[in-house]
Amino acid sequence: MASPASTNPAHDHFETFVQAQLCQDVLSSFQGLCRALGVESGGGLSQYHKIKAQLNYWSAKSLWAKLDKRASQPVYQQGQACTNTKCLVVGAGPCGLRAAVELALLGARVVLVEKRIKFSRHNVLHLWPFTIHDLRALGAKKFYGRFCTGTLDHISIRQLQLLLLKVALLLGVEIHWGVKFTGLQPPPRKGSGWRAQLQPNPPAQLASYEFDVLISAAGGKFVPEGFTIREMRGKLAIGITANFVNGRTVEETQVPEISGVARIYNQKFFQSLLKATGIDLENIVYYKDETHYFVMTAKKQCLLRLGVLRQDLSETDQLLGKANVVPEALQRFARAAADFATHGKLGKLEFAQDARGRPDVAAFDFTSMMRAESSARVQEKHGARLLLGLVGDCLVEPFWPLGTGVARGFLAAFDAAWMVKRWAEGAGPLEVLAERESLYQLLSQTSPENMHRNVAQYGLDPATRYPNLNLRAVTPNQVQDLYDMMDKEHAQRKSDEPDSRKTTTGSAGTEELLHWCQEQTAGFPGVHVTDFSSSWADGLALCALVHHLQPGLLEPSELQGMGALEATTWALRVAEHELGITPVLSAQAVMAGSDPLGLIAYLSHFHSAFKNTSHSSGLVSQPSGTPSAILFLGKLQRSLQRTRAKVDEETPSTEEPPVSEPSMSPNTPELSEHQEAGAEELCELCGKHLYILERFCVDGHFFHRSCFCCHTCEATLWPGGYGQHPGDGHFYCLQHLPQEDQKEADNNGSLESQELPTPGDSNMQPDPSSPPVTRVSPVPSPSQPARRLIRLSSLERLRLSSLNIIPDSGAEPPPKPPRSCSDLARESLKSSFVGWGVPVQAPQVPEAIEKGDDEEEEEEEEEEEEEPLPPLEPELEQTLLTLAKNPGAMTKYPTWRRTLMRRAKEEEMKRFCKAQAIQRRLNEIEATMRELEAEGTKLELALRKESSSPEQQKKLWLDQLLRLIQKKNSLVTEEAELMITVQELDLEEKQRQLDHELRGYMNREETMKTEADLQSENQVLRKLLEVVNQRDALIQFQEERRLREMPA
Amino acid sequence: MAKQYDVLFRLLLIGDSGVGKTCLLCRFTDNEFHSSHISTIGVDFKMKTIDVDGIKVRIQIWDTAGQERYQTITKQYYRRAQGIFLVYDISSERSYQHIMKWVSDVDEYAPEGVQKILIGNKADEEQKRQVGREQGQQLAKEYGMDFYETSACTNLNIKESFTRLTELVLQAHRKELDGLRTRASNELALAELEEDEGKPEGPANSSKTCWC
């Protein structure tokens, strides 16, 4: 080891440089180093080689080795790939710096300007495996010893910037601080080049710098001229970040991090948070880095209630503006949330200070996210070409909960540098742009799972990173408008037009719809469709349509005794329950023929779902593809209600509805009585008019989409995820649904209430083999209790039986228990617990434990484990929820527990990211839906009121309305698809929790267990198996749908 | 919606506790390996889609607890499997001996035409080896199975063995698959198939035995 008082000042400067934690210190020590070595700074790669040659210092060797290894990758051509390229990089954020480093390695001259003078962003970024590897290869561990030593992989923006800055400086990037880029200065005449407009007063040498590549990494708010930005709007989303001082005490190191909990799959956590603190969140993340970093999404209502926001303003800018936010209340809010999430184990939670010396807590809005339409452009004037590329937030604003910020940012930085290399190779502007755009298309789909596995191979070449790469996905032809020759008139991009044109051709006009309806109902006795009003009044036409699309549900003869209302009601319900087509208008309105627009909208659902299916064979048809997701969710919701109904069965009610019927409480007005025949539809929740596009049907009742929300938290409700309280008649999300009348306290959120149809259930049914959709005449199932017969009882019973089982796919015989008796299965399940009383083999193999973690830790030679390993205190179990119940047993298996925790964290992180992506898309869909509704309302008003307008105009409007309806339908479908994925995540989370709970029991001394323990252990195991079976049901559902799609 | 896969198969991993069934699965589906052992409770499954001869096969791989106390539970999942991995640990003679018992369980509970493959896992632990390669081969031959020595730790033969079993299942069901396809394209919907399977007797029965 060298003595601290080294004789060589250059060595001291190098040490200071490596250790420097402030931007100024980095720069000053680097200048000192260069001076001491007699090297001029900022001279590109040659500067690096000079420093390396001059500084013969052991401590620097390992760093040189790393940088040399990177620089020797063939793609850089020994730093000769871009020797004649001059680049200007704007912005020293992580992405700007990362791009600058790549450009320097390519041998380009790189000048970087940054308007700030220090790095002060504490916020912490999640790292993907490839970014970890990438940063390690650049010497991250050398500059920052704590790099990725925690249970989760992340780094504060500040540290990331510091280490990249150091690398950039070493590689000869010329960096100017406190200089703001304000625009481009085109070449004034032939022979001159592009320059930058900079403020304030840049050094003369910088002002006259002419460059041929501009990389803009100046953040989301700054996008160079010529680029168009697209806004992705979601529903209002308020994020809150908070940084607390990390004193690195033993207590603090023990507190487990939270890679993310999201409401959509873990309602319980948020419910208890709400109860304890009044804080209502969508999600929360906690990373332990330089600071204790928390980030969460808060609901507006609770911010208002807790006085964080002064008043409810519709403009988000104003809502979260300085004048409307109470800083002290925001601090209290963030602290309380952090305290709750960490079980108060972080002590007094003192805020870290932000750049201005104030507590580092901020509320921000991510309702809208910006995304550049294109990632690069070329401008040409007087023969001088300038290549412009975007990286970082100005290319795609990251959605923070995904933790994609730095990963996609780095990928884009690599792609931009690759583009510069291609540019330097002499590829034509259009070719370069087309390649870059092809890569840009891939960017938003990237995830750690779908990238190349071997992160060690990642390099500049896109082929090393993206599997299934097609650099010609975008053709040079398509990027012509990105090549801007200033001499021409500026060509305006026509952004939306091709889209609207497409939908025009794809939509079906009313005539086509009428024709289709005629075709579908042809031959049915007594049906003759000629219009969208009176033809449907007797209900027969609708029955005929349903019968044609789904034969076997009803024999025409059965219709004989039915009245028009009954027939129409039947058709509406069967279409919803069996075909997944939700009503748009009430049976009364259909009969009265008073709402032709509504009927058109309704029938167009059928048309778009079935138009591609041929029925010549007269066999069962299914909606071509996706509507089945809606169908599935509908079934799920109904089975959920049935479960509830069962619970309520004891409570006597004056007018008992059939059990199979989704129960509406007496409080809710009965539709048929209150609705004048032919009257326009009104929302049953707010009583206001419902325009066609706005109609949202639940159990035959119509609401505004926005009215159908949880009575407590006002969250939008989705099929499969809500319940109606029989007492007050209000709708609730499963989290807020009052539980008091449930007989059994539900330990696992909504497990019991969410009874997914499982294949296993078929074992419990004496008649499991009847595939419900195919039976012509349903066989009454003896398992169902006798109940009051109503006219459609056979159908109801049929439907009921279909709810519990997913019909087995045609590929396999229906599952049968090994000895074909459900009792046997149950008994064997019971007997399997008998063995639990005797000391069974420990769940671990001791020798495996010993070699446990060493391998997992690090292959990296300079790994310094600075953080003490989390001690084995019971507190740690808190994240593993129920494991806390028996700390004694846990301490015996430290390695087991640590690994389990680590794995759990990783899984949790994946699930969280997935959930957030879904949540975001759901919010976007909702926002788009609102826009469609507004548009549709306008059209509908025009159509209804202006009876004087010419027919031609009316027809045009009608077609437009139809188009909107179709758009809405496809959004509804996408929403349903996403909700299925949510179900999957939800189940995975439940499985994880049950698994942990069960392990808690299993590791207890068998002799210490009471009878009650054994019983609940038994119960948890059963629940676990049930959840696995439910997950399986989802897989089967997908398979079933695939099989249905096959003929198409 | 775009077609994401062509066919769905269910595979099943069985063998003594601690032979590395879960590790094999994690390595195959997530390319992850954790060396410390956490025993599986009951059953679990993971999904993966692979390409076999241009056919996108989605496989649902059921992972079972090896511990005896779960066997009544796990056996219930045998009947739905089309392919089964019988796994032992090359460093455990006992786990190898037990393969016999596992095979007899398969005979009893799994469907007739189920495809089987023998796996000797932990092939990286050469110094602790108790079961010779030839022994594995011999046993596999006896039962007419394919045999692989694998290592989840070093990623040896993982993909190969999973692909192989999938291929075997695919071959065994090729006829039915083709049949299904043609029938489907003739718009004979699966309703008929389902009904066929509901019938205890009849011409459809032949296809049933293959499909179990």
UniProtKB/Swiss-Prot annotation, chain A:
<feature type="site" description="Important for interaction with ARHGAP26 AND ARHGAP10">
    <location>
        <position position="816"/>
    </location>
</feature>
<dbReference type="GO" id="GO:0005884">
    <property type="term" value="C:actin filament"/>
</dbReference>
<feature type="binding site">
    <location>
        <position position="293"/>
    </location>
    <ligand>
        <name>FAD</name>
    </ligand>
</feature>
<keyword id="KW-0503">Monooxygenase</keyword>
<feature type="binding site">
    <location>
        <position position="393"/>
    </location>
    <ligand>
        <name>FAD</name>
    </ligand>
</feature>
<feature type="compositionally biased region" description="Polar residues">
    <location>
        <begin position="747"/>
        <end position="765"/>
    </location>
</feature>
<dbReference type="GO" id="GO:0005829">
    <property type="term" value="C:cytosol"/>
</dbReference>
<feature type="modified residue" description="Phosphoserine">
    <location>
        <position position="777"/>
    </location>
</feature>
<feature type="binding site">
    <location>
        <position position="710"/>
    </location>
    <ligand>
        <name>Zn(2+) 2</name>
    </ligand>
</feature>
<feature type="domain" description="bMERB">
    <location>
        <begin position="905"/>
        <end position="1048"/>
    </location>
</feature>
<feature type="binding site">
    <location>
        <position position="713"/>
    </location>
    <ligand>
        <name>Zn(2+) 2</name>
    </ligand>
</feature>
<dbReference type="GO" id="GO:0046872">
    <property type="term" value="F:metal ion binding"/>
</dbReference>
<dbReference type="GO" id="GO:0016709">
    <property type="term" value="F:oxidoreductase activity, acting on paired donors, with incorporation or reduction of molecular oxygen, NAD(P)H as one donor, and incorporation of one atom of oxygen"/>
</dbReference>
<comment type="subunit">
    <text>Associates with the SH3 domain of NEDD9. Interacts with VIM and PLXNA3. Interacts with RAB1B, RAB8A, RAB10, RAB13 and RAB15 (in their GTP-bound forms); binding to RAB1B is of low affinity compared to other Rab proteins; at least in case of RAB8A and RAB10 can bind 2 molecules of the Rab proteins simultaneously. Interacts with STK38 and STK38L. Interacts with GRAF1/ARHGAP26, GRAF2/ARHGAP10, RAB8A, RAB8B and RAB10; may bind simultaneously to GRAFs and Rabs and connects GRAFs to Rabs. Does not interact with RAB1 and RAB11A.</text>
</comment>
<dbReference type="Pfam" id="PF00307">
    <property type="entry name" value="CH"/>
</dbReference>
<feature type="binding site">
    <location>
        <position position="181"/>
    </location>
    <ligand>
        <name>FAD</name>
    </ligand>
</feature>
<keyword id="KW-0521">NADP</keyword>
<dbReference type="InterPro" id="IPR036872">
    <property type="entry name" value="CH_dom_sf"/>
</dbReference>
<dbReference type="GO" id="GO:0005886">
    <property type="term" value="C:plasma membrane"/>
</dbReference>
<feature type="modified residue" description="Phosphoserine">
    <location>
        <position position="616"/>
    </location>
</feature>
<dbReference type="InterPro" id="IPR001781">
    <property type="entry name" value="Znf_LIM"/>
</dbReference>
<keyword id="KW-0479">Metal-binding</keyword>
Swiss-Prot record, chain B:
<keyword id="KW-0636">Prenylation</keyword>
<dbReference type="InterPro" id="IPR005225">
    <property type="entry name" value="Small_GTP-bd"/>
</dbReference>
<feature type="binding site">
    <location>
        <position position="35"/>
    </location>
    <ligand>
        <name>GTP</name>
    </ligand>
</feature>
<feature type="binding site">
    <location>
        <position position="66"/>
    </location>
    <ligand>
        <name>GTP</name>
    </ligand>
</feature>
<keyword id="KW-0378">Hydrolase</keyword>
<feature type="binding site">
    <location>
        <position position="122"/>
    </location>
    <ligand>
        <name>GTP</name>
    </ligand>
</feature>
<feature type="binding site">
    <location>
        <position position="19"/>
    </location>
    <ligand>
        <name>GTP</name>
    </ligand>
</feature>
<dbReference type="InterPro" id="IPR027417">
    <property type="entry name" value="P-loop_NTPase"/>
</dbReference>
<feature type="short sequence motif" description="Switch 2">
    <location>
        <begin position="63"/>
        <end position="80"/>
    </location>
</feature>
<feature type="binding site">
    <location>
        <position position="18"/>
    </location>
    <ligand>
        <name>GTP</name>
    </ligand>
</feature>
<feature type="binding site">
    <location>
        <position position="40"/>
    </location>
    <ligand>
        <name>GTP</name>
    </ligand>
</feature>
<feature type="region of interest" description="Disordered">
    <location>
        <begin position="192"/>
        <end position="212"/>
    </location>
</feature>
<feature type="binding site">
    <location>
        <position position="22"/>
    </location>
    <ligand>
        <name>GTP</name>
    </ligand>
</feature>
<feature type="short sequence motif" description="Switch 1">
    <location>
        <begin position="31"/>
        <end position="45"/>
    </location>
</feature>
<feature type="binding site">
    <location>
        <position position="23"/>
    </location>
    <ligand>
        <name>GTP</name>
    </ligand>
</feature>
<dbReference type="GO" id="GO:0015031">
    <property type="term" value="P:protein transport"/>
</dbReference>
<feature type="binding site">
    <location>
        <position position="124"/>
    </location>
    <ligand>
        <name>GTP</name>
    </ligand>
</feature>
<keyword id="KW-0449">Lipoprotein</keyword>
<keyword id="KW-0342">GTP-binding</keyword>
<keyword id="KW-1003">Cell membrane</keyword>
<feature type="binding site">
    <location>
        <position position="152"/>
    </location>
    <ligand>
        <name>GTP</name>
    </ligand>
</feature>
<feature type="binding site">
    <location>
        <position position="22"/>
    </location>
    <ligand>
        <name>Mg(2+)</name>
    </ligand>
</feature>
